[in-house]
A protein has these predicted regions:
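Compositionally biased terminal segments of proteins
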Residues: 1-209
Length: 209
């Protein structure tokens, strides 16, 4: 009997799947066909932070030979993952900007052909502000990113975020007033861990956990 498709991808699993993807892609496309994947959203957060334990799918920007599609499917079949566990649907959302890749950073390389990159912290925050979805985890993700950087004494300032918003979207015009107010509030918060727990609790009541 076939297993039900897995709907949650954790940090450890993400690395396993990307490693397998590198192997499968190399088998199909050869060692002279390099590929690049830029992890966006939940995937970027899983790769770089510990506050988020899982994501239901991995949003990415993919530059690769046509064999990548088959490689993705093979990994999905091997690990009983949901269809489109790794996809480019993000490019059709409001938070997408063609400039995002300019502000990505190296994460890991697999099988000497697949380079995986992620998005810098302030750009993750900028995209979450642009999305501003209450039915997702956008606001709690912002706090989580700020919180973990504070714990490492790597302060993210309003200026850093402002620069990211301008670089991606040209101005703050597309950011809602609610999102702007939220950002100012959390940047002045003295206990981000407590604020994060409170917001996650309210998201849990809405069925977002």
């Amino acid at each position: 009997m076939l297993s039900n498709p897995s709907t949650d991808i954790g940090k450890k699993e993400l690395d396993i799947y990307l490693r397998e993807l590198g192997k499968e892609y190399r088998k199909l496309a050869g060692k002279k066909s390099p590929a690049e994947i830029v992890l966006i959203g939940g995937g970027a957060i899983l790769a770089n932070y510990n506050f988020r334990t899982s994501t239901t799918d991995v949003d990415a920007i993919i530059h690769a030979a046509s064999a990548m599609k088959e490689a993705i499917n093979r990994v999905g079949d091997k690990y009983y993952l949901a269809n489109r566990w790794l996809n480019e649907d993000f490019v059709r959302t409001v938070s997408y900007s063609p400039k995002i890749e300019e502000f990505s950073q190296f994460y890991r390389q697999y099988s000497n052909v697949l380079q995986v990159r992620t998005i810098k912290a302030e750009y993750i925050i900028a995209m979450k502000l642009r999305a501003g979805r209450k039915y997702k985890n956008d606001f709690s993700d912002i706090i989580g990113v700020l919180m973990e950087h504070e714990e490492k004494n790597e302060h993210i300032s309003y200026g850093d975020i402002d620069r990211a918003v301008i670089n991606l979207y040209g101005s703050w015009n597309a950011i809602t007033e609610e999102a702007k107010t939220f950002l100012k509030d959390v940047l002045s918060c003295k206990d981000l861990a407590e604020r994060y727990a409170e917001l996650r609790g309210s998201e849990g009541e809405m069925g977002l956990l």
